[in-house]
Amino acid sequence: MQNRPIIIGVTGGSGGGKTSVSRAILSHFPDEKISMIEHDSYYKDQSHLTFEERVKTNYDHPFAFDTDLMIEQIKELLAGRPVDIPTYDYTEHTRSSKTYRQEPQDVFIVEGILVLEDKRLRDLMDIKIFVDTDDDVRIIRRIKRDMEERGRSLDSVINQYLGVVKPMYHQFIESTKRYADIVIPEGVSNTVAIDLLTTKIAKILEEARNSK
């Protein structure tokens, strides 16, 4: 492993293709030590609230995340020490009792809707990416994901999108585009942007190895 891991931040609106872009980067480097860390894993524990109260949580607001813990754990990984990353139970709307062990890597992709919102987190990143996708495409993807993977009803997804997700995107997420080094329109389908990005990452890795 090289001396200092590369940190790549990937953000954009919910359903915008952040995870697909992150996975495209991962698949481009099968022989590298590279992992993805999701901001969603750091949703705050809500076990002290009733289920009805948890359901009303605004998950698209910065206060929903334990970003302090994420920053602390990324710093540990940068120092070459493993961490136990929390997991979130989307059916119970609270943090799970399970964690997973993340070992140090050469590259970490830090992915989530608000990973560029906190300056402390931005300052740890070597490359900052904003995936820019049309609102209509994002809501369709979100409906499909939340119904299939998170057990949500159509009405609940639509109501949450119109009441919380869309306004939070315009209030907190869209404005972080100005911090991005690279803006990728239409996400993973923009193969030119993905190729340019992976070429840049490969160059950074090569330079890091040559500087040893």
Curated annotation (Swiss-Prot):
Localization per Swiss-Prot or TrEMBL: Cytoplasm
TM stretches of this protein: none
Naturally occurring in which organism (per UniProt): Streptococcus pneumoniae serotype 4 (strain ATCC BAA-334 / TIGR4)
Gene, per the UniProt record: udk
Functional pathway: Pyrimidine metabolism; CTP biosynthesis via salvage pathway; CTP from cytidine: step 1/3; Pyrimidine metabolism; UMP biosynthesis via salvage pathway; UMP from uridine: step 1/1
This protein's GO CC annotations: cytoplasm
Cross-referenced SUPFAM superfamilies: P-loop containing nucleoside triphosphate hydrolases
Superkingdom: Bacteria
Protein name (record): Uridine kinase
